[in-house]
Amino acid sequence: MKRESYQAEMFNWCEALKDQIQKRGQLDQFEDQIDKMIEALEDDQTTEEDWYKQAAALYRDITESDDTSERRAYVPIGKHVLPKLPYKYSALEPYISRDIMILHHTKHHQSYVDGLNKAESELKKARATKNYDLITHWERELAFHGAGHYLHSIFWFSMHPNGKRRPTGALFQMIDLSFGSYSAFKEHFTQASKKVEGVGWAILVWAPRSGRLEILTAEKHQLFSQWDVIPLLPLDVWEHAYYLQYKNDRASYVDHWWNVVDWREAEKRFEQAKEVVWKLY
């Protein structure tokens, strides 16, 4: 996307944001931040990266202001919510179509949120009544829908039309240490993604027990993978992530996905994840 096109999209986003927070009665609270965002967009010396960082900070502040202090501290049982995307549904075209993004986000991810909330609520009811007849079912539902919700909540923010297509800094160095080179990592991750059996994910993770990165795959969301790791960069290879556009050609979807990957989220997660280091075995 050219600078002018992204700039126009950001201007529209700022105006829509103003309307939204005005309806919530919070315009006075955030008007200065939005105006500064608009000034940055008009400044020829600022970059798309500057705009992204400022918009992300503004979005975070507004989102957090809409939560209660309890909600910020933890998610009450059965109260998980669908995260909003940091870009338009059409933003990842031509690599991922608008129709796929709408269906994937509003239907499939929402179903995982709903399923997780249902499972948590049923397990809470079981504890209260001491009736554990269906515990096996609800624990499976908890694992499936919970993993689906959490992985998607990373996945959306690991893509962007103007994202960082190659990691740098500490994460790049750890990729080099863990896989030998970035190109070796990319080939490994690509091949793992293409060869997940059935439906599932390929995930770059930090492994605190080994002190390095690993590439894992998971069938569905939760099967045949490892514990004690922290996901950094996931790629969804369920058919609903690509079938409307690529039909049964998962390989083409995976190859094109590298055109929308955004390493900024993975780098941010790694900065926190690398602080978790267990005794090495």
From Swiss-Prot:
Broad EC category: oxidoreductase
Superkingdom of origin: Bacteria
Cofactor(s) in the UniProt record: Fe cation
Keywords (A to Z) from UniProt: Iron, Metal-binding, Oxidoreductase
Catalytic activity: 2 superoxide + 2 H(+) = H2O2 + O2
A GO molecular-function annotation: metal ion binding
Binding site residues for Fe cation: 104, 152, 236, 240
Cofactor note: Binds 1 Fe cation per subunit.
EC number(s) reported in the record: 1.15.1.1
Entry keyword annotation includes Calcium: no
Gene3D superfamilies linked to this entry: Fe,Mn superoxide dismutase (SOD) domain, Iron/manganese superoxide dismutase, C-terminal domain
Covalent S-S links between cysteines: none
InterPro entries registered for this protein in UniProt: Fe/Mn_Superoxide_Dismutase, Mn/Fe_SOD, Mn/Fe_SOD_BS, Mn/Fe_SOD_C, Mn/Fe_SOD_N, Mn/Fe_SOD_N_sf, SOD_C_sf
Homology family: Belongs to the iron/manganese superoxide dismutase family.
Function: Destroys superoxide anion radicals which are normally produced within the cells and which are toxic to biological systems.
Protein name per Swiss-Prot or TrEMBL: Probable superoxide dismutase [Fe]
Source organism: Bacillus subtilis (strain 168)
